Curated annotation (Swiss-Prot):
Protein name: Partner of Y14 and mago
Keywords annotated in UniProt: Coiled coil, Cytoplasm, Nucleus
Source species taxonomy: Eukaryota, Metazoa, Ecdysozoa, Arthropoda, Hexapoda
Organism: Anopheles gambiae (African malaria mosquito)
Coiled-coil spans in chain: 62-97, 167-199
PANTHER family membership: PARTNER OF Y14 AND MAGO, PYM PROTEIN
Residue ranges with Basic and acidic residues bias: 65-90
Self-association state and partner proteins as the record states: Interacts (via N-terminus) with mago and tsu/Y14; the interaction is direct.
Amino acid sequence: MTTYSTDSQGKFIPATQRPDGTWRKPRRVRDGYVPQEEVPLYESKGKQFAQKPALPPGLSPEVVQKAKEKRERERLRQAREEQQRKEQQNKKQQAGALPPGVLAVDGGAVGGNNDKQKPGAKQPQQHTKSSQQKSTTAAAAAVSNNSDSTVDELASALASGAQLAGADAQQLEVAKKLRKLRKKIREIEAIETKLRSTDGPKLDKDQLEKVKRKPDILQEIEELEVQYSAGAM
């Protein structure tokens, strides 16, 4: 820690003696000067925030711990109540799914009437089952007949659709061939224009072969046009 002295001219550091016996001169100190060893160290905001107390002033950690324990007990109590409520709801749903007069117990379903059923009481139930089986068989036969007719109609529709699709594909193929051949005719006509010009370039072998095939290409175009017109009708 630096020792300062003050005189009429201001603050100064008095002369000090070195280890070898020599003396340092007194040094005048400017107003507001802070020595390097007295400059406070820099601390980031995160470090300053970490040094602050986590609890508000006047609040003890014991009170905070008790409040946490109380909240935890309340949460567990609510969880138990929710579990019990779900179990009761499931029991009610299971009881509502049983027929009238039947009670849901742990061992299974028990009828409300404990009297022994008479042998004649089973006959109406058997009669009802046989009538239900007959109606089910008749309905299955009707569905089978309807299914067979529906399958036949669907098969005929698919066959006709396949024929139409095949015809459309054939027409599309003919149209593509016509476009290619007409393009070749345009190229041949361009070559012929070059031949008619006196100062035009000489033609190579491939170009001459194209010109020779012009009649064959025109004939093929006529045949395809007839075929395309017949398919469109």
